């Protein structure tokens, strides 16, 4: 389960992203969570990339999701 509100606050505090970009980033994390329930582990990205639903996204969307998940993992580390 994605901690959306806490993640938004973390992004506001730790990045220079606009509110729109923060909203997009949270949305991408939720899309990843819909493919494969998100969990705090280095291998999550590995398994996500092998998910059939994830593979249907365009290369650009997959790249955006990977970046968002990477940020979310950093958020969970703190």
Give residue ranges: language-model regions.
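Non-catalytic DNA-binding core/recognition domains of DNA-processing enzymes
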Residues: 17-78
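N-terminal DNA-binding module of tyrosine recombinases/phage integrases
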Residues: 1-6, 74
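Positively charged, polyanion-binding regions of nucleic-acid-associated proteins
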Residues: 6-16
């Amino acid at each position: 389960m994605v901690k959306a509100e806490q993640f938004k606050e973390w992004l506001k505090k730790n990045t220079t992203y606009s509110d729109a970009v923060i909203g997009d980033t949270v949305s991408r994390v939720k899309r990843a969570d819909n493919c494969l329930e998100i969990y705090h582990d280095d291998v999550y990205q590995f398994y996500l990339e092998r998910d059939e639903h994830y593979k249907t996204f365009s290369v650009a969307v997959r790249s955006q999701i990977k970046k968002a998940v990477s940020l979310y993992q950093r958020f969970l580390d703190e």
